[in-house]
A protein has these predicted regions:
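Divalent-metal (often Zn2+) His-rich catalytic cores of metallo-beta-lactamase-fold enzymes
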Residues: 344-357
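A residue-level signal for conserved active-site and pocket-lining positions in enzyme catalytic cores
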Residues: 214, 282, 340
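Active-site beta-strand/loop microenvironment that shapes enzyme catalytic pockets
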Residues: 52-56, 64-66, 71-75, 268-318
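A structural signal for short, well-ordered beta-strand segments and their strand-loop junctions
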Residues: 227, 292-294, 336
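A short, acidic, amphipathic alpha-helical segment used as a generic capping/interface helix at domain edges
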Residues: 316-331
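Small/polar glycine-rich anion-binding or flexible loop at a beta-alpha turn
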Residues: 298-302, 335-343
Length: 368
């Protein structure tokens, strides 16, 4: 893969880590290039006080921002996540030199902290190969978050069905359970131009976490039709078909697009949740699955993915499918998404919530 390195200032620790990481990329056959020359990722060397934004022109260019911080920072997680948002990054890698660390480069006492948009936050001792192994799979992943709309939703579904009513009710319950983190206050740290840039690039009209879906068999639209909450909405306020909840009738994997059936009065800015690719794979592969819930919470003893793939990528969807196949009953189970949350399947939303009520841990377990 081709990549670019962007830097405006000098920081000995950060730049030493960057040199080691660039060399590791070169050792593995990657090529340093320029942003206009078909790159797949950018190493953005910046700082938390004056963060630099690299404005990508495509979804599948991944931004890895490198910063440093003192071990005396009171809330390192908040600092890193704010920097992640302000730099529009896929990952922030923050180096924290330990006491006695080398003043002009990374030492064996330097810790690196990884922060992702899914609220992942974990750390490990600095090692170029280990950092490379955490980042490169992300750079090689592929978003599948597009939507292709058809005005073919049967009229009997223009108003919420019993299945949509269940999604509405359980969206409210998720909100009460506290497993839908509050959206990051983007306007406190980003210009309106940057916010609109994010929304345009990732086809969003807001930021939110978690999602619900439930199967509703509509034979004239396809064999695996299901309702799913829309992208960026308040899950506690699901009400309108074509705006808050959308009917997915299939997926075009070549184009990376969910095939969405809508009523005539749909919101043209509405988009189904970025996890639609994962849910569609589940419904198509396991006919017994009637509902899927994704929450930023944890359950003890679940199988877990080994790589932090971004939400909405084919690679994350395939990782979840591989885990489901390893469980005793893929149609009624829960699997973990590393440093992210859970995907929970069941024959119905009623069944899922009866199983998880009182068992969810609201703090996601972080793993390096």
């Amino acid at each position: 893969m081709k990549f670019a390195v962007i830097r405006e200032d000098i920081n000995p620790v950060r730049d030493g880590i960057a040199r080691a990481l660039v060399q590791k990329c070169l050792d593995h056959g990657h090529e340093v290039s320029t942003p206009e020359n078909g790159i797949r990722f950018v190493l953005n060397l910046t700082d938390s006080e004056h963060p630099r934004i690299f404005r990508r022109n495509a979804q599948n260019i991944f931004i890895f921002s490198l910063i440093t911080a003192s071990s005396s920072v009171k809330d390192l997680r908040a600092l890193c996540y704010t920097t992640l948002v302000r730099t529009l990054s896929n990952v922030v890698v923050c180096a924290v030199p330990g006491n006695g660390g080398a003043p002009f480069g990374p030492s064996d006492r330097t810790e690196v902290y990884f922060t992702t948009p899914e609220a992942g936050f974990y750390h490990l001792a600095f090692d170029p190969e280990t950092v490379y192994e955490r980042l490169i799979p992300i750079a090689g992943s592929h978003f599948a978050i597009g939507n292709a709309f058809s005005l073919d939703l049967p009229q009997r579904y223009w108003e919420p069905s019993a299945v949509v009513d269940k999604i509405r009710d359980y969206g409210r319950e998720l909100d009460r359970l506290g497993v839908l983190p509050a959206p990051f206050p983007l306007r406190e740290v980003l210009s309106e131009e940057s916010i609109q840039d994010i929304y345009r690039l990732f086809e969003m009209k807001g930021l939110s976490y978690g999602n619900l879906s439930a199967r509703e068999r509509i034979p004239e639209l396809g064999p695996a039709t299901f309702w799913m909450t829309a992208r960026g909405i308040n899950k506690a306020k699901v009400s309108k078909v074509g705006r808050d909840v959308l009917l997915v009738k299939g997926f075009d994997y070549y184009k990376g697009q969910a095939l969405v059936s809508v009523p005539p009065d749909h919101d043209p800015k509405a988009r189904v949740s970025v996890d639609a690719v994962e849910h569609e794979l589940i419904y198509r592969t396991f006919p017994e699955v009637g509902a899927v819930v994704h929450v930023h919470a944890w359950l003890d003893g679940v199988l877990c993915t080994t790589q932090n793939f971004p939400c909405g990528t084919i690679e994350l969807a395939e990782s979840v499918m591989n885990l489901l196949r390893q469980t005793d009953d893929p149609s009624r189970t829960a699997v973990g998404l590393k440093n992210h949350g859970l995907t929970i399947t069941g024959p119905s939303l009623d069944d899922i919530f009866n199983r998880i009520r009182g068992r969810l841990r609201t703090e996601v377990e972080m793993m390096s």
